[in-house]
Amino acid sequence: MFDLAIFENMFFWAIINFLILYLIYRKFFFKKVTAFMEKRSKMIQEQLDFAAKSKEEAIKLKEEYENILSQAHAKANEIVQNAMIEAQKQADKIIEDAKLEANKIIENALKQLDIEKKKQINELKNQFVSIALLAASKVIEKNLNTEENRKIVENIFDEAGVA
């Protein structure tokens, strides 16, 4: 039935076959496979290193760009602030110039008004003198009493339109 001797013999030859195949594979294939695996492992490691380096550079660039961007925002804010300050200065200057111009106009108007007032006063004085001379000449012509002189002067003023 079952012969153990045959089984032991087959087992022996199987081990021998396995060792021979192992030596052949080792001689011809394992070195190539090991070299290929090492080469592949090295290439993968290089790619991982390159990816890590690229990631670090990307992070550095991102930080640089964020720094540049924040500086640009700060510069823009500074420019806006300076522009607002300058605009306020110009607005204040325009307002001050307008006030000065308005004061000059008012001053000129007051001078013109004063000149016109003096002119009117002189004209009234001249009219008053004319009226007084006219009244005096009429008083002298009639040489009446004081009451009559007063009435004559009042009549002359009424005729001249002076109240």
Curated annotation (Swiss-Prot):
GO cellular component, one term: plasma membrane
Signal peptide: none
Transmembrane regions: 4-24
Subcellular location: Cell membrane
Family per record: Belongs to the ATPase B chain family.
Membrane topology type: Single-pass membrane protein
Gene: atpF
Keyword field: ATP synthesis, Cell membrane, CF(0), Hydrogen ion transport, Ion transport, Membrane, Transmembrane, Transmembrane helix, Transport
Protein's recorded name: ATP synthase subunit b
The keyword Manganese appears for this protein: no
Molecular function per GO: proton-transporting ATP synthase activity, rotational mechanism; proton-transporting ATPase activity, rotational mechanism
